[in-house]
Amino acid sequence: MEHKTKLIVRGGGDLASGVIHRLYRCGYQVLVLECRKPSAIRRKVSFGEAVFDGISSVEGVTGRLIEDVSECQKVWEAGEIPILVDETGKVIKELRPDALIDAILAKRNLGTTREMAPLTVALGPGFEAGKDVDFVIETQRGHNLGRVIRKGSATPNTGIPGVIAGYGKERVIHSPAAGIMHNLSQIGDIVEKDQIIAMVDATPVYASLTGVLRGIIRDGYEVPKGMKIADIDPRKEQKKNCDTVSDKARCIAGSVVEVLLANGVLP
Protein backbone atom coordinates (compact mmCIF):
# COMPACT_ATOMS: atom_id res chain seq x y z
CA MET A 1 0.00 0.00 0.00
CA GLU A 2 1.25 3.47 -0.86
CA HIS A 3 2.46 5.33 2.20
CA LYS A 4 0.55 8.50 2.95
CA THR A 5 2.32 11.04 5.12
CA LYS A 6 0.65 11.18 8.52
CA LEU A 7 0.91 14.17 10.82
CA ILE A 8 -0.33 14.76 14.33
CA VAL A 9 -1.27 18.24 15.50
CA ARG A 10 -1.70 18.72 19.23
CA GLY A 11 -4.38 21.37 19.74
CA GLY A 12 -7.42 22.48 17.78
CA GLY A 13 -7.81 26.19 18.57
CA ASP A 14 -7.95 28.92 15.94
CA LEU A 15 -4.20 29.21 15.27
CA ALA A 16 -3.79 25.44 15.32
CA SER A 17 -6.75 25.14 12.95
CA GLY A 18 -5.12 27.52 10.49
CA VAL A 19 -2.17 25.14 10.40
CA ILE A 20 -4.40 22.06 10.20
CA HIS A 21 -6.41 23.58 7.34
CA ARG A 22 -3.24 24.38 5.36
CA LEU A 23 -1.79 20.90 5.92
CA TYR A 24 -5.05 19.32 4.78
CA ARG A 25 -5.11 21.46 1.64
CA CYS A 26 -1.53 20.41 0.91
CA GLY A 27 -2.53 16.74 0.96
CA TYR A 28 -1.28 15.58 4.35
CA GLN A 29 -3.27 13.16 6.48
CA VAL A 30 -3.72 14.97 9.78
CA LEU A 31 -4.91 13.70 13.16
CA VAL A 32 -5.81 16.37 15.70
CA LEU A 33 -5.38 15.66 19.41
CA GLU A 34 -7.49 17.84 21.70
CA CYS A 35 -8.23 18.25 25.40
CA ARG A 36 -11.54 17.25 26.97
CA LYS A 37 -12.84 20.81 27.33
CA PRO A 38 -11.40 23.05 24.61
CA SER A 39 -11.66 26.74 25.48
CA ALA A 40 -11.51 28.28 22.01
CA ILE A 41 -12.61 31.89 21.65
CA ARG A 42 -12.74 32.04 17.83
CA ARG A 43 -14.96 28.98 17.75
CA LYS A 44 -16.11 29.37 14.14
CA VAL A 45 -12.58 28.64 12.96
CA SER A 46 -11.57 26.01 15.52
CA PHE A 47 -11.59 22.32 14.62
CA GLY A 48 -11.53 21.51 18.34
CA GLU A 49 -15.21 22.44 18.62
CA ALA A 50 -15.91 18.93 17.32
CA VAL A 51 -15.17 17.70 20.85
CA PHE A 52 -18.49 19.27 21.91
CA ASP A 53 -20.52 18.99 18.72
CA GLY A 54 -19.15 15.82 17.08
CA ILE A 55 -18.31 17.76 13.93
CA SER A 56 -16.68 21.09 13.07
CA SER A 57 -16.01 23.02 9.88
CA VAL A 58 -13.36 25.56 8.95
CA GLU A 59 -13.59 27.17 5.53
CA GLY A 60 -15.25 24.15 3.98
CA VAL A 61 -13.03 21.52 5.62
CA THR A 62 -14.73 19.14 8.06
CA GLY A 63 -13.33 17.88 11.33
CA ARG A 64 -14.95 14.79 12.88
CA LEU A 65 -14.68 13.53 16.44
CA ILE A 66 -13.49 9.93 16.77
CA GLU A 67 -13.33 7.66 19.80
CA ASP A 68 -10.32 5.59 18.79
CA VAL A 69 -7.27 6.04 16.58
CA SER A 70 -8.41 3.03 14.53
CA GLU A 71 -11.14 5.26 13.05
CA CYS A 72 -8.63 7.63 11.43
CA GLN A 73 -8.38 5.86 8.09
CA LYS A 74 -12.13 5.87 7.53
CA VAL A 75 -12.33 9.60 8.26
CA TRP A 76 -9.35 10.37 6.01
CA GLU A 77 -10.91 8.37 3.19
CA ALA A 78 -14.07 10.47 3.58
CA GLY A 79 -11.97 13.59 3.01
CA GLU A 80 -12.28 14.77 6.60
CA ILE A 81 -9.97 15.41 9.54
CA PRO A 82 -10.19 13.09 12.58
CA ILE A 83 -10.18 14.72 16.01
CA LEU A 84 -9.42 12.65 19.09
CA VAL A 85 -9.51 13.59 22.76
CA ASP A 86 -6.02 12.73 23.98
CA GLU A 87 -4.48 15.24 26.35
CA THR A 88 -1.28 13.30 27.00
CA GLY A 89 -0.57 12.14 23.46
CA LYS A 90 -0.75 8.45 24.29
CA VAL A 91 -1.79 7.49 20.73
CA ILE A 92 1.31 9.07 19.20
CA LYS A 93 3.33 5.86 19.59
CA GLU A 94 0.52 3.86 18.03
CA LEU A 95 0.09 6.06 14.96
CA ARG A 96 3.83 6.74 14.52
CA PRO A 97 3.41 10.05 12.64
CA ASP A 98 6.00 11.36 10.20
CA ALA A 99 5.90 14.68 12.03
CA LEU A 100 4.31 16.17 15.13
CA ILE A 101 3.22 19.79 15.53
CA ASP A 102 2.51 21.11 19.02
CA ALA A 103 -0.05 23.87 18.48
CA ILE A 104 -1.57 23.90 21.96
CA LEU A 105 -0.21 27.42 22.54
CA ALA A 106 -0.21 27.01 26.31
CA LYS A 107 2.90 29.24 26.52
CA ARG A 108 4.62 26.22 28.09
CA ASN A 109 5.45 22.67 27.11
CA LEU A 110 2.72 20.23 28.17
CA GLY A 111 4.74 17.13 27.38
CA THR A 112 5.91 17.23 23.76
CA THR A 113 9.37 15.74 23.15
CA ARG A 114 11.63 15.23 20.13
CA GLU A 115 11.28 11.48 20.59
CA MET A 116 7.60 11.55 19.64
CA ALA A 117 8.23 11.79 15.88
CA PRO A 118 11.06 11.98 13.33
CA LEU A 119 10.31 15.72 13.02
CA THR A 120 8.83 17.89 15.75
CA VAL A 121 7.63 21.49 15.54
CA ALA A 122 6.15 23.73 18.23
CA LEU A 123 4.29 27.02 17.98
CA GLY A 124 5.13 29.87 20.31
CA PRO A 125 6.98 30.23 23.63
CA GLY A 126 7.70 27.44 26.10
CA PHE A 127 9.91 25.34 23.83
CA GLU A 128 13.60 25.36 22.95
CA ALA A 129 14.41 24.42 19.36
CA GLY A 130 17.07 21.74 19.24
CA LYS A 131 16.22 20.54 22.74
CA ASP A 132 12.47 20.14 23.34
CA VAL A 133 11.55 20.04 19.64
CA ASP A 134 13.41 20.35 16.34
CA PHE A 135 11.91 23.70 15.31
CA VAL A 136 9.91 26.49 16.92
CA ILE A 137 7.68 28.98 15.07
CA GLU A 138 7.37 32.57 16.31
CA THR A 139 3.74 33.45 17.07
CA GLN A 140 4.03 37.01 18.37
CA ARG A 141 2.62 39.64 16.01
CA GLY A 142 5.23 41.91 14.48
CA HIS A 143 8.27 41.72 12.24
CA ASN A 144 9.23 38.16 13.26
CA LEU A 145 5.79 36.56 13.11
CA GLY A 146 6.15 33.15 11.45
CA ARG A 147 9.93 33.07 11.70
CA VAL A 148 11.35 29.53 11.83
CA ILE A 149 13.61 29.17 14.87
CA ARG A 150 16.25 26.46 14.60
CA LYS A 151 18.03 27.19 17.86
CA GLY A 152 16.52 28.88 20.88
CA SER A 153 12.98 29.92 21.75
CA ALA A 154 10.15 32.14 20.60
CA THR A 155 9.55 35.52 22.23
CA PRO A 156 8.33 35.02 25.82
CA ASN A 157 4.64 35.65 26.43
CA THR A 158 4.05 39.29 27.33
CA GLY A 159 0.39 38.83 28.19
CA ILE A 160 -0.39 41.82 25.97
CA PRO A 161 -2.29 41.11 22.72
CA GLY A 162 -0.97 42.48 19.45
CA VAL A 163 -2.17 45.97 18.57
CA ILE A 164 -4.98 46.19 16.00
CA ALA A 165 -6.31 49.60 14.93
CA GLY A 166 -4.60 51.17 17.93
CA TYR A 167 -6.02 48.75 20.50
CA GLY A 168 -4.05 46.06 22.33
CA LYS A 169 -5.03 44.74 25.74
CA GLU A 170 -8.46 46.37 25.38
CA ARG A 171 -9.36 43.87 22.65
CA VAL A 172 -9.36 40.92 25.02
CA ILE A 173 -11.95 40.37 27.74
CA HIS A 174 -11.27 38.25 30.82
CA SER A 175 -13.85 36.73 33.09
CA PRO A 176 -14.77 39.07 35.97
CA ALA A 177 -15.75 36.12 38.15
CA ALA A 178 -15.76 32.35 38.36
CA GLY A 179 -18.90 30.63 37.12
CA ILE A 180 -20.89 29.47 34.11
CA MET A 181 -20.93 31.50 30.88
CA HIS A 182 -24.30 32.70 29.61
CA ASN A 183 -23.74 34.45 26.29
CA LEU A 184 -25.99 37.36 25.33
CA SER A 185 -24.07 38.23 22.16
CA GLN A 186 -22.86 35.97 19.37
CA ILE A 187 -19.69 35.84 17.30
CA GLY A 188 -20.00 38.39 14.51
CA ASP A 189 -22.27 40.76 16.42
CA ILE A 190 -21.44 44.47 16.44
CA VAL A 191 -21.17 45.47 20.09
CA GLU A 192 -20.87 48.86 21.78
CA LYS A 193 -18.44 49.72 24.55
CA ASP A 194 -19.90 48.87 27.99
CA GLN A 195 -22.66 46.73 26.45
CA ILE A 196 -23.33 43.56 28.44
CA ILE A 197 -22.29 40.72 26.12
CA ALA A 198 -22.51 37.83 28.59
CA MET A 199 -23.11 36.86 32.19
CA VAL A 200 -20.84 34.71 34.35
CA ASP A 201 -23.52 33.41 36.66
CA ALA A 202 -24.90 36.73 37.99
CA THR A 203 -21.88 38.87 37.07
CA PRO A 204 -22.16 40.89 33.85
CA VAL A 205 -19.42 40.88 31.21
CA TYR A 206 -19.05 44.26 29.51
CA ALA A 207 -17.70 44.97 26.03
CA SER A 208 -14.33 46.67 26.48
CA LEU A 209 -14.67 48.67 23.27
CA THR A 210 -16.93 49.17 20.26
CA GLY A 211 -16.38 46.72 17.41
CA VAL A 212 -17.19 43.26 16.14
CA LEU A 213 -17.28 40.35 18.58
CA ARG A 214 -14.55 38.25 16.97
CA GLY A 215 -14.82 35.42 19.43
CA ILE A 216 -16.45 34.35 22.68
CA ILE A 217 -16.09 31.14 24.64
CA ARG A 218 -19.02 28.76 24.22
CA ASP A 219 -22.22 29.18 26.18
CA GLY A 220 -22.37 27.01 29.29
CA TYR A 221 -18.60 26.82 29.74
CA GLU A 222 -17.40 26.94 33.34
CA VAL A 223 -14.70 29.59 33.67
CA PRO A 224 -12.38 30.67 36.47
CA LYS A 225 -11.97 34.35 37.28
CA GLY A 226 -9.47 36.03 34.97
CA MET A 227 -9.76 33.55 32.11
CA LYS A 228 -9.79 34.94 28.56
CA ILE A 229 -13.39 34.64 27.38
CA ALA A 230 -13.88 37.05 24.47
CA ASP A 231 -12.12 39.06 21.78
CA ILE A 232 -13.35 42.26 20.10
CA ASP A 233 -11.98 43.64 16.82
CA PRO A 234 -12.36 47.44 16.67
CA ARG A 235 -12.60 47.25 12.87
CA LYS A 236 -16.32 46.74 12.25
CA GLU A 237 -15.61 45.86 8.62
CA GLN A 238 -13.95 42.68 9.89
CA LYS A 239 -17.39 41.21 10.64
CA LYS A 240 -17.19 39.18 7.42
CA ASN A 241 -13.93 37.59 8.58
CA CYS A 242 -15.19 36.04 11.82
CA ASP A 243 -15.60 32.66 10.13
CA THR A 244 -12.34 32.61 8.16
CA VAL A 245 -8.76 31.78 9.13
CA SER A 246 -6.81 34.86 10.26
CA ASP A 247 -3.77 36.40 8.62
CA LYS A 248 -1.71 35.41 11.67
CA ALA A 249 -2.79 31.77 11.47
CA ARG A 250 -2.07 31.63 7.72
CA CYS A 251 1.40 33.08 8.25
CA ILE A 252 2.23 30.50 10.92
CA ALA A 253 0.77 27.71 8.77
CA GLY A 254 3.07 28.63 5.89
CA SER A 255 6.07 28.38 8.19
CA VAL A 256 5.03 24.91 9.33
CA VAL A 257 4.75 23.77 5.71
CA GLU A 258 8.20 25.27 5.05
CA VAL A 259 9.71 23.19 7.85
CA LEU A 260 8.03 20.01 6.61
CA LEU A 261 9.12 20.43 2.99
CA ALA A 262 12.65 21.54 3.89
CA ASN A 263 13.06 18.36 5.94
CA GLY A 264 11.68 15.97 3.33
CA VAL A 265 8.27 15.42 4.90
CA LEU A 266 6.24 15.58 1.71
CA PRO A 267 2.47 15.01 1.35
Where in the sequence are the language-model features?
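Well-ordered secondary-structure scaffolds
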Residues: 2-267
